[in-house]
């Protein structure tokens, strides 16, 4: 049975764009579009009658002698000018024409009953006269429509010209399907079967029947949305990544953490930082059980167990487990210090070192200890400080078994065993194990004391000394003993105090066998045996075993009494005297005797009292061998042998061997009866 004649419109082989889509194409894509359209149009025209002009459309009453498709494309004009310039009217038989244009082929090509005209988006319709319906079956088979099974080879009525046309159409589809988003080339009957458009574009909401059309659409969006950094030339596919990158150049850090005030240029960095304050460490190492806040830190830590060090320095051969460590190491060879402080001009190899240094000028200490409230400029310092409260000392010396809070302290301790003192002072020749110790020592020769107390004007060589001194004014004592609740201004004092509860006495004198809780006390004790007094007063020539005694003695000449009681205003030359005096106001007697329970306001009084229970008398007179429990009483006794009477009455000039006798004598003049 013969089928009605079919019509094929130009839109079946056209590549269509909306006006918005056309603007998205770059010049190269637009040029390719024109070339393809010219080829499509000329191929279709070549299938018509011989006398059809190359510039004339084979259409329903439409001929473009001056405004033809080829001339439009050859002039490189945009397809949108055609829509605005062409005026279409209806001719008497109801078909559309361009005003003032005639074609002798229009009635012949478009008069068959049942013909359908398909318009493209410009309002132009191209109709091709076909004698039978079978060629559409061939087209359907070419494009794989499962609803029609008849092949072109089954029907001998298809002419070579018609087969040639479908070959052209297949060629156009196969060659240009990846360059543009196509209007479908399938016949109208197959379009009926494919009415659903399940593939939607997220950019503008347009939907497509096949996934390849959506893919081609997304390629245009991606090509249109490439972002190039004008500062460094780096290219990004998303606007969000481009915006993040630009903050590197501008220094913008819009994400702020409210706890410590630290700012970040990415939200992910803020999320990582929050784990520092929360203490969250979700990443666990199965080898040793150590936990980490970030997966990257865990991966880096694992290399300790494997011993993997893939990053090697070409200069010295030293290997590193992470690339950043190698990068930091290379600066040592180049000597480069690109990061300079704008406040003081000091330069640094690493940005992190500069950031740490800047807290010296700002005084910023954003990392707070939850136990005692102490602030730190670096998170590493806070982590190390926390071990003071927990008592954790994870770093152990393999030589002697001594344990330490930090790895740096263990490294410094190891040099005791190795005897390495690489850092030598050019002034006096003294050698030190660490560079920081040498730097601190050099201040002795220069006399420089750069750290000044704002309250009293006292200056110090070291910042730590100033920090400890400031606690005298503030009364701050952040270190607390868990056994008795006593508080201290310095951690070293707390550690020293703890040995009272444990009874630990590690340091023993080889001369007399006496043991001490602190090495400094042992060193002071040794001077008793040697008789060495290296510290001399420039004013009176008096010599002392300890530098602290010399400093204390100088106050006698200057009359300086920098320590003042907040309760009564009384001033003292020594801080220990002030601390002792405060017990008068508080009535506190923190020192208790384990034998009888008697309490004392001073530790020295407790030590003196203990000798009552032990019967110990350590102080012996060399003249008569008499022994005393106190050194002060031995000193008084010596005056008997020497005849020295250092205590003089201001009223009558009478002298006495003891201060107590002088006080008793003075009551005669004042007529006081003690």
From Swiss-Prot:
Signal peptide (UniProt feature, chain positions): none
Main localization, broad class: nucleus
Ranges where the KRAB domain occurs: 8-92
Keywords in alphabetical order: DNA-binding, Metal-binding, Nucleus, Repeat, Transcription, Transcription regulation, Zinc, Zinc-finger
SMART domains tied to this protein: KRAB, ZnF_C2H2
Keyword Ribonucleoprotein recorded: no
GO CC field: nucleus
Gene3D superfamilies: 6.10.140.140, Classic Zinc Finger
SUPFAM superfamilies the UniProt entry points to: beta-beta-alpha zinc fingers, KRAB domain (Kruppel-associated box)
Ranges annotated as C2H2-type zinc finger: 199-221, 227-249, 255-277, 283-305, 311-333, 339-361, 367-389, 395-417, 423-445, 451-473, 479-501, 507-529, 535-557, 563-585, 591-613, 619-641, 647-669
GO MF terms held by the record: DNA-binding transcription factor activity, RNA polymerase II-specific; RNA polymerase II cis-regulatory region sequence-specific DNA binding; zinc ion binding
Recorded family membership: Belongs to the krueppel C2H2-type zinc-finger protein family.
Compartments, as annotated in UniProt: Nucleus
Official protein name in the record: Zinc finger protein 534
Gene Ontology terms: biological process: regulation of transcription by RNA polymerase II
Gene for this chain: ZNF534
Function summary: May be involved in transcriptional regulation.
Native species: Homo sapiens
Domain of life: Eukaryota
